[in-house]
Amino acid sequence: MQVLVRDNNVDQALRVLKKKMQREGVFREMKQRRSYEKPSERKTREKSEAIRRARKLARKQAIREGLLPAPPKKKLPERKPPLPQTAARPAG
């Protein structure tokens, strides 16, 4: 996996690399490979993941077709207005 470092900006390159690794599923695979997973456990996990994906897809399809209401959008907390600035005291 390659990431370009532009203008010696290593922080930005690291963020891009992390995002790429997340998309590829590298972190998930590393977590799974920490310990041995029996083939039967792997099969049940993969089956449950497939069921979860199918349910999610069906739910999105139903929302798109209007059979289910769309989930309510999360409300952002209201910002407080900034405090009024007081006049600077004269030195002396």
Curated annotation (Swiss-Prot):
Pfam families: Ribosomal_S21 (PF01165). GO terms for molecular function: structural constituent of ribosome. One of its GO terms (biological process) is translation. GO terms for cellular component: ribonucleoprotein complex; ribosome. Residues 25-52 have a biased composition (Basic and acidic residues). Residues 25-92 are annotated as: Disordered. InterPro entries: Ribosomal_bS21, Ribosomal_bS21_sf. Keywords: Ribonucleoprotein, Ribosomal protein. HAMAP family: Ribosomal_bS21. Belongs to the bacterial ribosomal protein bS21 family. PANTHER family: MITOCHONDRIAL 28S RIBOSOMAL PROTEIN S21, SMALL RIBOSOMAL SUBUNIT PROTEIN BS21M. This is Small ribosomal subunit protein bS21A. It comes from Bradyrhizobium diazoefficiens (strain JCM 10833 / BCRC 13528 / IAM 13628 / NBRC 14792 / USDA 110). The gene is rpsU1.
